[in-house]
Amino acid sequence: FLGALQSIGSWPSFLSYAVMGGIVVWIGLYTENVFLLVAAMLIAPFAGPAMTLAIATARGDAHLVGRSLLRYVAALTASIVTAYLLSVIFDQRIATELMVETSMRSTVSLLLPLAAGIAGALNLVQSERSSLVSGAATGMLVAAALAPPAGLVGMGLALGEMDIVVSSLWALGIQI
């Protein structure tokens, strides 16, 4: 429980990670480099609020639930705005093939947030010594579900590609 509370961190550093994650997602989608999407998943600070929200919900701590949701919304907003601004600044005019591919959703898309949630729950209930997967790896799985769609929302808005925006918002919605 204490680890989850400590993962909340200060606002400036938290938002800096969200912006940096948004920049790396944007570069990855813009240059069609999947490896950069993985890097963005490592940088994006979505795991802390997710794990804290899970603990707060289990404890019935409404104040901590509110703080966790605020952090979630702030991180997503920072990532979306960053991707939007970069698309505008660099005068991006068309969606890349990777953007289109990443925005496509199917019923199989529901498996990622389900797997991420189960992995996160297992990580929270196991002691550090008995856990086979580190908290960082579990955090990456949570971020994997959120970082690319958040970037796609911003880029899609900048391009006026509402199909990409709607599909990415749908992905964010089912994953949160």
Task: List the predicted regions and their residue ranges.
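Short charge-dense sequence patches
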Residues: 2-4, 103-104
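Short, amphipathic, aromatic/basic-enriched membrane-interface segments that mark the entry/exit
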Residues: 3-13, 136-141
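Core alpha-helical transmembrane segments of integral membrane proteins
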Residues: 7-87
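Generic detector of multi-pass transmembrane helix bundles and their immediately adjacent loops
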Residues: 70-176
